[in-house]
């Protein structure tokens, strides 16, 4: 009988270890979640002596939907590998986007090759009024209310990089006031001033 008790106790210990392993694996698997958008996938060919070698390129936008975004370009023989390379490249080029609430601080224009993108602040509830490539960048950056217009090139690569150039050109009202030597009240949006007056901050 004592032997049976030992076997039962061993089984219970094993069950407890399994439960600990299962419960302990959860937090270890939790990682920072990023929003990923594949903007364009193209098949390209390289002409070599034996013929043509095909591969794929992927333009990917990655962000945390909270003011951080990056763009990457990946190339590989398979589409999933190209996307994975694009994601890693985008993470290497993360930058912060100044925001006021859910919109941008001021109108801004970005250019890349023949592509031009105009961005304007919008009131809460407006949404992202933009085409596919521009929308992908703004959503990954966490800009939820904005008006945009694309001019010139329709190439998604140019449009995405023009959007990034526009976002990089944004400045917070405090920076603008310091550069111009003006009080913050002269350059800050009314909504920001009301929020500060109410003690909510920005």
Curated annotation (Swiss-Prot):
Residue ranges annotated for the S5 DRBM domain, each copy included: 34-97
GO cellular component, one term: small ribosomal subunit
UniProt entry tagged with the keyword rRNA-binding: yes
GO biological process, one term: translation
UniProt keywords, alphabetically: Ribonucleoprotein, Ribosomal protein, RNA-binding, rRNA-binding
Origin superkingdom: Bacteria
Disordered: annotated segments: 1-31
Stretches with biased composition (Gly residues): 1-13
Biased amino acid composition, Basic and acidic residues: 14-23
Pfam families on file: Ribosomal_S5, Ribosomal_S5_C
Tagged with keyword Ribosomal protein: yes
Database matches in InterPro entries: Ribosomal_Su5_D2-typ_SF (IPR020568), Ribosomal_uS5 (IPR000851), Ribosomal_uS5_bac-type (IPR005712), Ribosomal_uS5_C (IPR005324), Ribosomal_uS5_N (IPR013810), Ribosomal_uS5_N_CS (IPR018192), Ribsml_uS5_D2-typ_fold_subgr (IPR014721)
Molecular function (Gene Ontology), one example: structural constituent of ribosome
Annotated transmembrane regions: none
Protein family per UniProt: Belongs to the universal ribosomal protein uS5 family.
UniProt comment concerning the protein's domains: The N-terminal domain interacts with the head of the 30S subunit; the C-terminal domain interacts with the body and contacts protein S4. The interaction surface between S4 and S5 is involved in control of translational fidelity.
Summary of the function given for this chain in its UniProt record: With S4 and S12 plays an important role in translational accuracy. Located at the back of the 30S subunit body where it stabilizes the conformation of the head with respect to the body.
The name this protein goes by in its record: Small ribosomal subunit protein uS5
């Amino acid at each position: 009988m004592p032997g049976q008790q030992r076997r039962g106790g061993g089984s219970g210990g094993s069950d407890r270890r399994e439960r600990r392993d299962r419960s302990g694996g959860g937090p270890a698997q939790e990682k920072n979640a990023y929003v990923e958008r594949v903007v364009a996938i193209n098949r390209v060919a390289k002409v070599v002596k034996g013929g043509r070698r095909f591969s794929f390129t992927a333009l990917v936008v990655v962000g945390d939907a909270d003011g951080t975004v990056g763009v990457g370009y990946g190339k590989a023989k398979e589409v999933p590998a190209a996307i994975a390379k694009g994601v890693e490249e985008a993470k290497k080029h993360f930058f912060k986007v100044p925001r006021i609430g859910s919109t941008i601080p001021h109108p801004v224009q970005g250019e890349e090759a023949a592509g031009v993108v105009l961005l304007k602040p919008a009131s809460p509830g407006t949404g992202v009024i933009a085409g596919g490539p521009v929308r992908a960048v703004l959503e990954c950056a966490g800009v939820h209310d904005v008006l945009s217009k694309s001019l010139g090139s329709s190439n998604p690569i140019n449009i995405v990089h023009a959007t990034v150039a526009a976002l990089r050109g944004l400045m917070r009202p405090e920076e603008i006031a310091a550069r111009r030597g003006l009080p913050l009240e002269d350059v800050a949006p009314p909504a920001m001033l009301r929020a500060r007056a109410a003690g909510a901050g920005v």
